[in-house]
Amino acid sequence: MGRILDISGQPFDFDDEMQSRSDELAMVMKRTQEHPSSGVTPNRAAQMLRDAERGDLTAQADLAFDMEEKDTHLFSELSKRRLAIQALEWRIAPARDASAQEKKDADMLNEYLHDAAWFEDALFDAGDAILKGYSMQEIEWGWLGKMRVPVALHHRDPALFCANPDNLNELRLRDASYHGLELQPFGWFMHRAKSRTGYVGTNGLVRTLIWPFIFKNYSVRDFAEFLEIYGLPMRVGKYPTGSTNREKATLMQAVMDIGRRAGGIIPMGMTLDFQSAADGQSDPFMAMIGWAEKAISKAILGGTLTTEAGDKGARSLGEVHDEVRREIRNADVGQLARSINRDLIYPLLALNSDSTIDINRLPGIVFDTSEAGDITALSDAIPKLAAGMRIPVSWIQEKLHIPQPVGDEAVFTIQPVVPDNGSQKEAALSAEDIPQEDDIDRMGVSPEDWQRSVDPLLKPVIFSVLKDGPEAAMNKAASLYPQMDDAELIDMLTRAIFVADIWGRLDAAADH
């Protein structure tokens, strides 16, 4: 394929061979994890973070891998953020006021990505950037009919990459060179999740979470040692003056063995005493572990009450924290959408579109982050609101996440209740018996009469509500009463009573 333009407008020669399969990277791609978290100290952690600031991302990436693997609480909280993205519906939308060709391109991309088996896994793997700051997936290109498309995305170890020393925001593959190997255009799906402002090596949550991770592990280790001796009697061996080192070692072995096997032997002349059982409290250890886990939850999800039970008011505070978590999720999908548009949508369009591509009018992925409305509350409010305003049905369906029926699709309906007329008495009067029926009906109350009568009555109240608000209108209710015009209402009620009386008399006469 000839030269094409990347998303920044620079021409390049497209190569569909995977960059990681080149001979110069063969040894680099075979690396294994170093597991720097084993025995990590605050000083060692600080050194790894400083290395990442200078562009060496290897140790920090390996450290993040270990943290997620070893800490179940950290893993659980990260999983909530990653899986929240996968739970969202999405679509490829064209630019605003799209032309026919732009709509065609968007439909083509939407259909392909929804059918792509690798896309959901790619979304999940992109979530790895939340902790590590970046996620790198190599694109394997192939053919689908006449379309040049990705057939697979391969997640690559973040430790394989470094930052360009001359531009710490540019990721490159690590090789034997000082600057690293530049990434192949259209060859990588790179997602950067910025949890903080800074260079690529400082974006990840790992830099914040490493400290509660270390302090929690210290407390867990100390707590385990406390449990080993808690409740056990103190064992003291006594040896006579002049005992040899061998005799002392024999006594020490007996002291240690008797704690595990409840038996042992010692030389004559030596004694073994049992003191009071070791006591103490586990509260300090558990308090430290609890603090560390809450700090981890705050850093990842913005709060703690979406994770565990709280004290009084936990329900309302939990709802607030859940709203914060939704805001974090929306920010995550906003960053992810930009990465997808840059590294997947644009290359697909550049390689397969029949028209000239305008960088400013590209289709893009749109995640549906809207929440379904409370159907009970809306069902009660909509009829009342509809009395004073025009409400589009499409808006109600969007709020409730109820789709519009397509074609002759079956729809749910309420079956009308058929009254049982068997036990009802047949009407005693007929049109022939009462030729004046139409005249009596005209004397009754029509909907229009009711509206004309009520409008003057309520006009002062409505005006006060619109001008000052409902609360002010309630306070002024007593003063508004004299302004209400009830003349029409009195006349309407008089007519209604008269008609009801006439119908009652005629019905009674017919029964006789």
UniProtKB/Swiss-Prot annotation:
Keywords: Capsid protein, Host cytoplasm, Late protein, Viral capsid assembly, Viral contractile tail ejection system, Viral genome ejection through host cell envelope, Viral genome packaging, Viral penetration into host cytoplasm, Viral release from host cell, Virion, Virus entry into host cell. It holds the Pfam family Portal_Mu. It comes from the Viruses. GO terms for cellular component: host cell cytoplasm; viral capsid. InterPro entries: Portal_Mu. Cleavage by the viral I protease yields a C-terminally cleaved portal protein competent for DNA packaging and procpasid maturation. One of its GO terms (biological process) is symbiont genome ejection through host cell envelope, contractile tail mechanism. Induction: Expressed in the late phase of the viral replicative cycle. Expression of late genes is activated by the viral late transcription activator C. It is found in: Virion; Host cytoplasm. Forms the portal vertex of the capsid. This portal plays critical roles in head assembly, genome packaging, neck/tail attachment, and genome ejection. The portal protein multimerizes as a single ring-shaped homododecamer arranged around a central channel. Binds to the terminase subunits to form the packaging machine. Acts as a linker between the capsid and tail. Required for attachment of the neck proteins to the capsid. Homododecamer. Part of the immature prohead complex. Might interact with viral I protease; this interaction gives rise to an early 25S initiator complex. The scaffolding protein Z and the capsid protein T should then be added to this initiator complex to yield the immature prohead. Host GroEL and GroES are also essential for the correct assembly of viral head and tail. This is Portal protein.
